[in-house]
Amino acid sequence: MFELNDDFVIQKEEFSKSFIYIIDNFYKNPEQVHDYLFENEAPLHKIEEVPTSNNVYFEDRRLFKDDERLIPVINFLSELVSQKPLTYELLTNQTKFYIDDFNDYKNCYWWPHHDAGYNGIVYFNNDNQNGTNIYYEIKSKKMLTEHYQPWRSKNDFKVLKHLEPKFNRLVFFDGYKFLHGMNIVNDRYFSDEYRKNQVFFFKDLLDDFT
């Protein structure tokens, strides 16, 4: 199921004293992987949190599932960056938006945040625009919960780099070092189509991330 391509090329880019990896044609059978990951709607993420805007102005759905077939993929990525997996679970994101002034993507960025270490994202839409941004925070403000007020003013952030999406492309970057978030630049996902990806999380053992 999760066999990697035999002949992919690992692109390694030095960026701000770190490395970003891009691997096109990551999976050998990406359509099969896609159908397995997204055959059903995943549960709404953190829907128990109050207050929440999830399932009110947008749908943030995530799958958490044990699948031993994924272990070799996670181990490969772990060795690539010398970081320990945060989890061996299969993880996906499915996101779409409702048409409402709340979703002001023209003036706001979606939830810039840090994670525990390196992040791997495999994109599963035929889309070359709505990828992942890396930011510099110009104005530091109190963070609210992700699902209550996820949109942040563009005046508070500078985009340092956009990681362009492509079907079956893996992007792999240090999510602890770099503030980052989903890049939404048009209304493509304001209908029935979900923005879909698979994610991997790792932990920088030199940092105490809680």
Region annotations inferred by a language model:
Residues 100-210:
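Catalytic core of non-heme Fe(II) oxygenases with the double-stranded beta-helix
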Residues 1, 5-7, 120, 157:
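Intrinsically disordered, low-complexity regions
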Residues 2-99, 103-110:
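Non-heme Fe(II)/2-oxoglutarate
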